């Protein structure tokens, strides 16, 4: 460890600032889900056409995570964070100014570049910066920042977009990032790269069947979730025939349930992670199958969203903990791969939802999403039986 001993208060401040950064990065990835209709209206496009922006963003992150991580593997981490935040902020200013849809997509690609690097180093940085014996809590704090992006970031971003225009949402995120950057500059010491891995560690990781199986499970289950979730805002308004305000409330409920999922996993994850993930995937299958039937009332959709939010948070946390446990010798490479694979799933799900909405009916997004969700459930049960001991390992 190259960090000088510091007080627990300062150590926690560093981790909290990193968690706030995680909140901001996740908010900007997810916030277009709540703004699709507004963006489409301003550029005179169909909502589903604008939705392709979600796929482009996610796939840029997927493709660039590993190359960027390797390119920056020897770079001092504090300096790297400053550079990626500058790119992140500048790209949000361009989003605010975007004079056509193409410029907006270009700005989102810039944000995706910053995102790709950020998520490949965040988990390992949180572990390094945490007070002694508090590594698991530090990771949990980063996960909470991620959860809050769905609980608060996405709905608040949508409310700001409704009342002040979607451009203001992106500008506000950029300003939040600027404040966070100033805090990081003030708080962080120099952080030489360590345990970053290199291309040499790739064959080693790919020779771990339990890890590869987790990656496959991740892409399939994330595709299932985002097939429906990417278009939940227009689904609520156009299929269920409910108000724009209720769409905001529903996003708030779904995100808030994620906090419950985080608490459940924090309580039971150490001993029963594999079982929890399988149960959560089964719950996701049920939620997707019931999405259209639940569209007959606000109450039914609200109840469904609670279970959906709990399920996806448990799945996400379970996958991340397992990846870190199975690759303690190359955390940055393993997490860069995980981030890339997760985003392949986001992009694939958003694209499937896009095609279903354009060429079939938006009402079918739940049923179509349930197909890969069922496949994921079978795969989750199979791998938990094949590697029951390995998959229960936890990072120490």
Curated annotation (Swiss-Prot):
Task performed by this protein: Involved in the efflux of sugars. The physiological role may be the reduction of the intracellular concentration of toxic sugars or sugar metabolites.
Keywords of this entry: Cell inner membrane, Cell membrane, Membrane, Sugar transport, Transmembrane, Transmembrane helix, Transport
Transmembrane intervals: 15-35, 50-70, 81-101, 103-123, 136-156, 169-189, 209-229, 246-266, 275-295, 301-321, 333-353, 363-383
Family from the record: Belongs to the major facilitator superfamily. SotB (TC 2.A.1.2) family.
Protein location: Cell inner membrane
SUPFAM superfamilies, per the entry: MFS general substrate transporter
Organism the protein comes from: Salmonella newport (strain SL254)
Recorded topology in the membrane: Multi-pass membrane protein
InterPro entries tied to this protein: MFS, MFS_dom, MFS_Efflux_Transporters, MFS_trans_sf, Sugar_effux_transptr_put
GO cellular component: plasma membrane
UniProt superkingdom: Bacteria
Pfam family membership, one: MFS_1
The protein, known as: Probable sugar efflux transporter
One Gene Ontology MF term: carbohydrate transmembrane transporter activity
